[in-house]
Amino acid sequence: MTIKDNSQLFPLAKQQVNMRSVLAVMNAAEQLRDASSELIPSLLRECKKIDWIYNPLEYAWAPHAEWIRRFSGNGATTLLVGMNPGHGMGNTGVPFGCPEQVRDLLEITNLEVHQPNPLHPKRPVLGLKCPKPEISGRRIWSSLAQRYGSAHLISQTIYIVNHCPLWMFNQSGKNITPDKLTGPATQCLGSICNDHLLAVVDAMSIKRVIGIGRYAQRQVDALFKNLELGWVPHPSPASPFANRNGGADWRRAFEMVLEH
């Protein structure tokens, strides 16, 4: 079969739908990137708990865009929603992007990750070659790989985003989560994050949205009234449940949510 005969394997209409999905998700991410970066000075002024803000959509845009290009147009109808970046996405630009799994499972490699400016001395960014794993991301991606197989097969069912794109710390480098923020700029941030989530759901024709952790669950429950919704406890190593029985209890809970 020649290249011109590809339409017999992949109907043109389906190709166009997938490409429209990718372009719409990319556009939504670009808007979120730019709008959230514009809010950073106001957030730093108004929120006394935060002293440092990174936006991985800015400095790690290349791998994030690759994530969108390769995995947002493959037919997934279930969306997993996290809270905001941690060490994984903070280094790789991929939601829950444990560096080893971004490299080995997603095969996103050899893309430039810039340095945030200013850089917190206790929060270095090493990019895709970062040797330190993110336990939350490792738990999620290893469970998905065990259930579905390759990254492409995962993306035919599952896509992942974070509600908030910003990685925030206090002066000592302690992680500050979005639920700790207050002030008008925080309300603006929540609004643009909601707009992004709505755009992704619309672009991908998502049927089911699963919040990862209580914060994400609350955002999902408030936004979507006509979709199937779910929730799974956050896999953070700071969670006693996620650590129980070596993580087996969390994996079982995740499996049950995916099977529902």
Regions found by a protein language model. Give the residues of each.
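Short loop/helix-cap segments at secondary-structure boundaries that form the rim of catalytic
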Residues: 220-226
